Curated annotation (Swiss-Prot):
Belongs to the MoaC family. Substrate binds at L75, C76, H77, M113, E114. One of its GO terms (molecular function) is cyclic pyranopterin monophosphate synthase activity. The gene is moaC. This is Cyclic pyranopterin monophosphate synthase. It comes from Burkholderia cenocepacia (strain HI2424). PANTHER family: CYCLIC PYRANOPTERIN MONOPHOSPHATE SYNTHASE (PTHR22960:SF29), MOLYBDOPTERIN COFACTOR SYNTHESIS PROTEIN A (PTHR22960). Pathway: Cofactor biosynthesis; molybdopterin biosynthesis.
């Protein structure tokens, strides 16, 4: 891995110039989890939350989060996303919900930040819709699981050390 790219020689923050980079298909997959009380999990699983379809609303929020990443992260490039796929996995054993987001574009820079933002916004929406019954929910283990495309090539979390 090279040095930090968002700082110039004088140490000032700047947006990286990607103008000379080749356009390629870029994919990133991120994942995160929200743990909750069994009763809260049952409300989500059974579709009985007072605010409505928790995972349906969270899916739309995650998609919107991916699309708005450049507005939230100061040095992120605004990207024309070609796909945002959001999946929720109910986990009885936790109990909790896993959110997996795949973001794609055809461009000059990766979509890892968009995938991470989408996961966080989706899980924050679950929290918001259920906080009246469970203020102790915990969002955890948010990470990039995979990235494809670009000069640095493909990467999977299991390839990382530690």
């Amino acid at each position: 891995m090279s040095g930090l790219t968002h700082f110039d020689a004088a140490g000032h923050a700047h947006m990286v110039d990607v103008g000379d980079k080749q356009e390629t298909r870029r994919i990133a997959i991120a994942r995160g989890t929200i743990r909750m009380l069994p009763a809260t999990f049952a409300l989500i699983r059974d579709g009985k939350a007072k605010k409505g379809d928790v995972l349906g609303v969270a899916r739309i929020a995650a998609i919107q989060g991916a699309k708005r990443t450049a507005d939230l992260i100061p040095l992120c490039h605004p990207l024309a996303l070609t796909r945002v796929a959001v999946e929720f996995e109910l986990d009885d054993a936790l109990p909790g919900v896993h959110c997996v987001v795949q973001v794609e574009t055809f461009g000059r820079t990766g979509v890892e930040m968009e995938a991470l933002t989408a996961v966080q916004v989706g899980l924050l929406t679950v929290y918001d819709m259920c906080k009246a019954v469970d203020r102790g929910m915990v969002i955890t283990d948010v990470s990039v699981r995979e990235k494809r495309g670009g000069k640095s090539g493909d990467w999977k979390a299991e390839d990382a050390a530690g």
